[in-house]
């Protein structure tokens, strides 16, 4: 293995188009010793996050911090492992899902857009969970085998699957409830819809008309084409006001949807925002609006429905449960597009367009 590797580095504050540079002189992390439980992951795919693309244009580089390598979630294979690493992660070539701690990315620059990562064992899990299988037809009778989860799909499952799982729990979605998913064709939204259906909820998905078949295929009972309605809240009120939703899961970040929610959301039931926002909004205006939604009492003009702003760090143990759902045939992960490492800027353009159906990935190896 070479002593250096390629990676994308943020050189200064500014839009990703001007602040990122691909270099080939990053040091390859040293092999863990016999007393370490760390894993060296040879990165195959990196999943891109909308929030990280936005943050690069806002936050300055921290004093004395090394150049920042962005992104946190990857899939790949074990290159080497420390002597105290879990047995299932020691074999070189083992396919894994992994992530770096977001604070480590911000403070120490240890992000994912590079060829190799050294990670603590708690941030790495094997891709295949062999204890779970699904029954399939076989020429010689019935056979059981795990539903395949590819490295690409696995990379797309880590952050978005964790976010979807946490949002559904935060809304306490239960069997028989009616749920509105805004942005049902997105990287998080299409997983949210499936998890709600898995709990027995009736799901209405909002997306553009070209995504109708996609949205229905990934869990929605009904579809609303927002492009056909100049005033979406008015349409929702007239169509669903007599049968309000038990919760609204907003994967887009629509203030109008929340401001008008008493017209189509049951009293005491929440709108949960996954932390979505517009690239055109300033950080201060976004934070101000989120704060007003969360804390402003109704007697001061606040909306009389709970507002939950949800943002979470991916939970690798939670990811394991999602991997099991995929292997059992209960969950599907859609990849919007894959880009070569050299085409990161084009990939971020796709992410920030908010037109991606599913996850956008960078292919490293």
Curated annotation (Swiss-Prot):
NADP(+) binds at residues 185-188, 226, 274-275, 354-355. SMART domains: PKS_ER. The keyword Nucleotide-binding applies. It holds the Pfam family ADH_zinc_N_2. CDD domains: MDR1 (cd08267). Its EC number is 1.-.-.-. SUPFAM superfamilies: GroES-like, NAD(P)-binding Rossmann-fold domains. It is an enzyme of class 1 (oxidoreductase). Medium chain reductase; part of the gene cluster that mediates the biosynthesis of pyrrocidines, fungal natural products containing a macrocyclic para-cyclophane connected to a decahydrofluorene ring system that show potent antibiotic activities toward Gram-negative bacteria. Within the pathway, pydE functions synergistically with pydB, pydX and pydZ to form the cyclophane. This is Medium chain reductase pydE. It comes from Acremonium sp. The lineage of its organism: Eukaryota, Fungi, Dikarya, Ascomycota, Pezizomycotina.
